[in-house]
Structure formats: C-alpha cells, structure tokens
Curated annotation (Swiss-Prot):
<dbReference type="InterPro" id="IPR011335">
    <property type="entry name" value="Restrct_endonuc-II-like"/>
</dbReference>
<comment type="function">
    <text>Endonuclease that resolves Holliday junction intermediates in genetic recombination. Cleaves mobile four-strand junctions by introducing symmetrical nicks in paired strands. Promotes annealing of linear ssDNA with homologous dsDNA. Required for DNA repair, homologous recombination and chromosome segregation.</text>
</comment>
<dbReference type="Pfam" id="PF03838">
    <property type="entry name" value="RecU"/>
</dbReference>
<keyword id="KW-0460">Magnesium</keyword>
<feature type="binding site">
    <location>
        <position position="97"/>
    </location>
    <ligand>
        <name>Mg(2+)</name>
    </ligand>
</feature>
<dbReference type="GO" id="GO:0000287">
    <property type="term" value="F:magnesium ion binding"/>
</dbReference>
<keyword id="KW-0378">Hydrolase</keyword>
<keyword id="KW-0233">DNA recombination</keyword>
<protein>
    <recommendedName>
        <fullName>Holliday junction resolvase RecU</fullName>
        <ecNumber>3.1.21.10</ecNumber>
    </recommendedName>
</protein>
<comment type="similarity">
    <text>Belongs to the RecU family.</text>
</comment>
<dbReference type="GO" id="GO:0004519">
    <property type="term" value="F:endonuclease activity"/>
</dbReference>
<keyword id="KW-0227">DNA damage</keyword>
<feature type="binding site">
    <location>
        <position position="82"/>
    </location>
    <ligand>
        <name>Mg(2+)</name>
    </ligand>
</feature>
<keyword id="KW-0234">DNA repair</keyword>
<dbReference type="InterPro" id="IPR011856">
    <property type="entry name" value="tRNA_endonuc-like_dom_sf"/>
</dbReference>
<dbReference type="GO" id="GO:0006281">
    <property type="term" value="P:DNA repair"/>
</dbReference>
<keyword id="KW-0540">Nuclease</keyword>
Length: 199
C-alpha cells in the first residue's frame, strides 16, 4: 500500500514478539573468551604458552549442497575430553579446567566427570600444576581452586553434591579480573606455588 504524499510503503507490524531463547550450551562462552584473551596476552608477551584443547570429534555424515560448501550434519565425540586448557609456564606443565555457574552459593559437581578427576590426579602425580577456574557469573567472582582440593571434595561422595562457595573460598584463591590480562591466573601460580612474580 502506498502512503500519499510520500510514496512510502507501509510495513506490517507484527504483534507477535520474538521470544528470547536461552542457549545453555554457550553460557560459559564469555568466561571462556576472557580466558582465551588472557592466554593470547601471555603468549604475545612470551610469558606462557597455554592453549585450549580441541575436542576430539568423529565426523559421520557430511552434506555437500555446493562443491565449495561442505556441511557436517552428524558427528560424535570420539572420546571423553580431559580438561579445557594445557601448556607450559616457566618450564612447568600447566593443566586446568574452567567452569561457570549462575548459582550464588555453590558450584554443581555434576559439571565434573570422573575421567576429568582422574586426569587431574595423574597430572599432579607427574608434578604438573593443575587447577580449576570457577566463575560465579551472578556474583562476578572467579576462583582458582587447586586440583587437590577439587579431588578431595569429589572423593567425599563421588561428585554427587554441589561444592559450597565457602569451601572454594577457604581452599582456593580469588582471581581479580583485570584489563590485561583479564583473568590473571598466573599471578596466583607465581605467588602461591612458585614464589615470585611472573613479570
């Protein structure tokens, strides 16, 4: 329909509003992005070499709608992944997992799997530095929890309970978010485990 005198086309306004979808699969992406930016900062300054581990996937079916555009339509995890990140800092092997929750009082232990706990125990046995970064998004607080504290709590009831934030505060270290790096977890490693400053 043309609107005289301006010859504008009137657009229909839909009375149905779009519902906001919550994508639970990507809840931790902003925290993960902050860790990735931190690792990029450490790498660019030659402080540490730490990378996110790729998840091993077996591709089963691929569609080729066009020769230049392959689309994966079916894939499966080939094996259970261990932890999210690994690398080297001052000659020390570093291995850690990152978890995020919206809860204010506890970190759900269902976020941790037995194969991850076993992997962390193996890293500790080889004298590696192993820990978890726990982010409470509602509180805007992040903690560095040594793997041994996580393993000890997990062994109490095979990971069926939630880990209270009081336990995390007592056994871990609060990570102060910054601009560069955003999640300065190497400060905690240096000050509490290696006895110095990473700069």
């Amino acid at each position: 329909m043309v609107n005289y005198p301006h010859n504008l086309i009137r657009q229909k306004v839909s009375s149905v509003q779009k519902q906001n979808k919550v994508d639970f699969a990507n809840r931790g992406m902003s925290f993960e992005a902050a860790i990735n930016a931190t690792n990029d900062y450490y790498l660019s300054r030659q402080i540490a070499v730490i990378h996110k581990k790729p998840t091993p996937v077996q591709i089963v079916k691929v569609d080729y709608p066009k020769r230049s555009r392959a689309k994966i339509v079916e894939a499966y995890f080939r094996q259970a992944s261990t932890t999210d990140y690994c690398g080297v800092y001052k000659g020390h092997y570093v291995d850690f997992e990152a978890k995020e929750t919206r809860q204010k009082t506890a970190m759900p232990m269902k976020n941790f799997h037995l194969h991850q706990i076993e992997h962390m125990a193996c890293v500790l046995h080889q004298k590696g530095i192993c820990f978890v970064l726990l982010h409470f998004s509602t509180l805007k607080e992040t903690y560095y929890l040594p793997a041994q504290a996580l393993i000890s709590f997990y062994q109490i009831d095979n990971g069926s309970k939630s880990m209270p934030i009081d336990y995390i505060r007592k056994n871990g270290f609060k990570v102060a978010f910054g601009a560069f790096p955003q999640v300065p977890y190497l400060n905690i490693i240096e000050q509490n485990f290696l006895g110095g400053d990473y700069n």
